[in-house]
Amino acid sequence: MEAMSHSIRRSLQPFARSRRSWRSPARRAEQRWIHIQQLQSAEPGLVNGNYLPASTTANSASSPDAKFRVLGAPYSILSVTLSASQNLYTRRGTLVGLSGKADNVISTLSLLEPARRALLRIPFLYQKISSTSPITALISTRSAITTFSVVEMNGSVDWMIAQEKALLAWTGHSLRIKPRLTRQLSLSHWGNSEVTGRGLLALVGTGQLYSVELKAGEQYISHPSNVVAYTITAPSPRPYRFKSTILPFQIPSLGIGKRLSDSNFIKNLSDTDTWKAALKLWHIIRTWSRRTIWGDRLFLQFDGPATILVQSRASRMADTLTTQQVNEIADAPPGVTQDAVDRAAAKLGEEETVPKAKDDLKPTTAISGQSVASVRRDGKVEFHQTGVGQ
């Protein structure tokens, strides 16, 4: 029986193979081959046309006496490790917690140049934290859409903080932060901060922060509301306006405008308060339209070598550029509009030099001659005019 069953099994094997071969086409029809491979990340290169060397900012920085580390995804909290007798300055109300010996910690409220910073709309209330033993502090902001970035200052490169509320915390005995007045921007953006020395900085921006590295000879165009900070080794950023499609309409000149301007009616009308109010209203409407409708064409141009920190969310155009700067950029031809700014500065310089020249001419015109008095024997006094007038 065993031999018989073995022979039956061997005889059924070809049938089983053929049966499996019959089912294999249906199974092959249901199968899909998936090929998975790792993609190579794009390498940042030149900024002029080919690549954009933009990357995320550093999430940690260290010095011999302190260490800054950004935690969270997206970055939402800052961890600060301080050594003994090291000072930490953080904005008032941003300290979340602290670990270490609490009895050795000293916290005081510091007023950093309140007069100048208040005029420039820069925060001046900071909390100074120091300890005789090593501590670790956690710092955060009240806003839910801000992220952190840390900058290590080694003394070779100085930074300019473009946003007045971007500076959150810093440490370093030789670090110096000076408020700077930028009259080219609007009143809400007059205050910039120049940072020099050695130490660590903690900056905050709206949305996500990115770093753009420029080499020598490279250029980068950025919206002024998105710039958080930049190095000041390179030339100052210049206003820039993109080209647009314009359909010029040429109307033959008939001399009507010149005739109307020469008439007495137009001259008397231009001196009235109603005419001046109408011109002022037209100027306001034109500036508003340039900011609102054509505001996306107003940018800033940076020249390398430079490092620029930009934020993904920006403020309004009205909070960044003044009325005068918007009109100067809009009236200038497309491209680099530094010529318009230079002409405005030269005009202002000429107005200042003309009064000085007039003052210098006053002493020379006042002294036009010399009078000599002689007393006669009878007691009368005679005056004789001599000098230039003779």
From Swiss-Prot:
Give the organism the record lists. Answer: Blastomyces gilchristii (strain SLH14081)
**Biological process annotations from GO:** inner mitochondrial membrane organization
| A GO CC term assigned to this protein in UniProt | mitochondrial inner membrane
InterPro entries found in the cross-reference section: AIM24 (IPR002838), AIM24_sf (IPR036983), Trp_RNA-bd_attenuator-like_dom (IPR016031)
A single Pfam family it belongs to is AIM24
Its taxonomic placement starts with: Eukaryota, Fungi, Dikarya, Ascomycota, Pezizomycotina
All disulfide bonds of the chain are none
What keywords does the record list, in alphabetical order? Mitochondrion, Transit peptide
Renumbered residue ranges of the record's region Disordered = 348-373
Q: What is this protein called?
A: Altered inheritance of mitochondria protein 24, mitochondrial
Q: Does the keyword NAD apply?
A: no
Kindly list the places in or outside the cell where this protein is found, as annotated in its UniProt entry: Mitochondrion
